[in-house]
Amino acid sequence: MSDRDPKSESSAETRLPSEPARRRETGRLPPRGLSPDTLREIGLFGGLDEETLGVLSRELPIENITVGTRVVNEGDPAREMFVVLEGELEVLKKSPSGAEVRVAMLGPSSWFGEMSILDVQSRSASVRALAPSRLVRISAEHVDRCLYRRDLKAYALFVMNIARELSRRLRVTDSILAHFMGSVAEVYAPKKRG
């Protein structure tokens, strides 16, 4: 079975190769080129001890992504998340008409795909690189082996950091929805006649 999407072959957009191919194409950095100091600066790893940061920095691969590459696709199976070290990416959702709409921008220290670590569902959105980017790939197996089986406290902190970010995103979404619904109500509310 091919990883290629015939619908996107004619466009300038590319899809991220399968995991084995990605491992061969990690670019200028070795797959294990992280440092504990780099991870410490990212909120996802907040509160983790030095030893755990050391284990993660040795185990988590870095991937170099070119402009136009679709890192993940809405609806695809998912078992990994990504942390942005460098670059700029856009998060896209399909509208009811089928058009893709940008719903967020991602830059250094952002992460995406975390829901796949928690709920084992298909991708809820697509992510495409707008600039050359360097990403850390964290699979469910990494979380299990490096955190859950090794140190339950570290695992709990990691999941709590994800929960905090999901809560922040939900608050932003609630605010946007309230603003939108208020605007719709103003336009379509019956006018009082005097």
Regions found by a protein language model. Name each.
Residues M1-G194:
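Cytosolic regulatory regions built on CNB/CRP/Popeye-like sensor folds
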